[in-house]
Design a protein with these regions (language model features):
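C-terminal alpha-helical "lid" subdomain
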Residues: 1-34, 38-86, 255, 259-362
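Dynamic helix-loop-helix/coil hinge segments at AAA+ ATPase domain boundaries and subdomain interfaces
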Residues: 15, 78-102, 109
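Walker A/P-loop NTP-binding motif of AAA+ ATPase domains
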Residues: 92-96, 102-271
Length: 362
C-alpha cells in the first residue's frame, strides 16, 4: 500500500516543493504498478509531461489553456471531475438535469437519426442556490473536466481584446473533451441597448452569440447568472435548456440540514431541528450548509453543551433580533423548545439580559 506517502506528498505540494512532489509521485507510481496499474500509468504520464516541459494537463489529454496576449494570464482554470454528492434541488430542476445527462449518454443515437443532441444549459437563480455545484456535479457525472472562464483575465481594457479572448477560449473548448463553464455570464452577455456603450459590449455579445451557435455537439457549455434580467435576449435562444434554480423549499431544506449536520444529526432534538427547518425559509442552500458548519464548530468549541444548545446559539446569532417584538418571539421560541430550562440559559443563548427575558416571557 502507498498510504504512507500521501501525507508527505500533501506537505510537499503545500510547501511548493516541486522536486519532492515529483520524487514521491515517482515512488507511488512504482509501488502501484502491481496493485493498480491504471493509477500507476496515470501518475507516470503526469510525470512524463512535466519532465518534457509540457503542461501536466496533457497527461489527461487536455491541451494548454489559452492565455491573454498582453498579460499572459490563463483565460480559464481547469478542474478535473471529482466525485461529489448529487445536489439537493427541487424535483423539476433535478429532473431536467437528469434528462440532460440521459440525452448526453444517447448522443450517438440522436446523431444516427439526424437529431441534434443538446449541449448547453443556462442556469439562473439567486446567489447560493447551487449553480456552481451543479456544474461540478455534471462534470463528475459526464466525466469531463470543468473549464471555468476567468473573468478577471478574459475581460480586457484594450479594444477588441475581450472578444478575442472569448473566441480563443471557445476554440480551445471545441478541440477538447471538456465542459466550458461561463460563470457570471451576464458580465459578457449584457443587453445591447446601453446608450452609453461605445460598441465594445455589443462586439463582445456578438462574438459570444456566434461562438455559442458554432459549438459542435461534442462540447458542453454551461452558463450561470444571478441576474437573468441583464442578459441579452438573443443569449437565451442559444442555450438548449434554461433552468431556474430556485431557493430550497421545505423538503430540500430538511435534506440539506440532515446532510450538513452529518453524524451530529442524531444528537439534535426534534423541536430544535424544527426551529432550524422553519427558520431557514429564506436561506439559500449555501446559507444552510454554512450554518451547519458553524453549528458543528460550536459543538467542538463548547463540548460541555449539548448539540441542540449549540444549534440554538448559532440560530440566534443568525436571526440577530433587534426589535422588541423579535426578541419576545425568540425568547418564547426558546422557552417552548424544551432545551432552555431557565431564564439564565435563554439569556446566555440570546445575549438578552435576564431581566428582559423575564419581562418578555410574561
Amino acid at each position: 500500500m502507498t498510504y504512507e506517502y500521501i501525507p508527505k506528498l500533501i506537505r510537499a505540494a503545500l510547501n511548493n516543493d516541486r522536486k519532492n512532489v515529483e520524487a514521491i509521485a515517482l515512488l507511488m507510481g512504482r509501488k502501484l504498478r502491481r496493485e493498480d496499474p491504471g493509477i500507476s500509468e496515470e501518475i507516470m504520464r503526469a510525470l512524463a509531461c512535466v519532465n518534457t516541459g509540457a503542461s501536466v494537463m496533457r497527461s489527461i489529454d487536455i491541451s494548454p489553456l489559452p492565455v491573454d496576449k498582453e498579460t499572459r494570464n490563463q483565460l480559464a482554470k481547469v478542474d478535473e471531475p471529482l466525485k461529489i454528492e448529487a445536489p439537493i434541488l427541487q424535483a423539476d430542476v433535478y429532473n431536467q438535469l437528469n434528462e440532460f445527462l440521459r440525452e448526453r449518454q444517447l448522443i450517438d443515437k440522436f446523431l444516427e437519426q439526424d437529431i441534434i443532441p443538446p449541449n448547453s444549459i443556462l442556469l439562473y437563480g439567486k446567489p447560493g442556490v447551487g449553480k456552481t455545484y451543479i456544474a461540478k456535479w455534471l462534470s463528475y457525472m459526464l466525466n469531463m473536466p470543468l473549464v471555468t472562464l476567468d473573468l478577471a483575465s478574459a475581460i480586457s481594457s484594450y479594444l477588441g481584446r475581450s472578444g478575442q479572448n472569448i473566441k480563443s477560449l471557445f476554440e480551445f473548448t471545441k478541440s477538447q473533451n471538456v465542459i466550458l463553464f461561463l460563470d457570471e455570464i451576464d458580465a459578457i452577455a449584457k443587453k445591447r441597448d446601453d446608450a452609453s456603450d461605445l460598441g465594445e459590449l455589443k462586439r463582445l455579445v456578438n462574438v459570444l452569440l456566434k461562438e455559442l451557435e458554432d459549438c459542435p455537439v461534442t462540447c458542453v457549455i454551461i452558463g450561470a447568472t444571478n441576474h437573468p434580467e441583464l442578459l441579452d435576449r438573443a443569449i437565451w435562444r442559444r442555450f438548449d435548456r434554461e433552468i431556474n434554480v430556485s431557493m430550497p423549499a421545505l423538503d430540500q431544506r430538511k435534506e440539506l440540514l440532515l446532510r450538513g449536520l452529518g453524524s451530529y444529526g442524531s444528537e439534535i432534538s426534534k423541536n430544535v431541528f424544527d426551529i432550524l427547518l422553519k427558520g431557514t425559509q429564506d436561506f439559500s442552500a449555501a446559507d444552510i450548509c454554512k450554518m451547519c458548519e458553524h453549528i458543528k464548530r460550536k459543538a467542538v468549541l463548547y463540548p460541555e453543551k449539548n448539540f441542540s444548545i449549540c444549534a440554538l446559539m448559532e440560530y440566534c446569532e443568525l436571526m440577530h433580533p433587534q426589535k422588541k417584538e423579535e426578541k419576545i418571539k425568540i425568547c418564547k421560541l426558546l422557552k417552548s423548545c424544551g432545551e432552555c430550562e431557565s431564564l439564565k440559559s435563554i439569556s446566555e443563548i440570546t445575549g438578552i439580559p435576564t431581566s428582559s427575558v423575564d419581562r418578555y416571557l410574561k
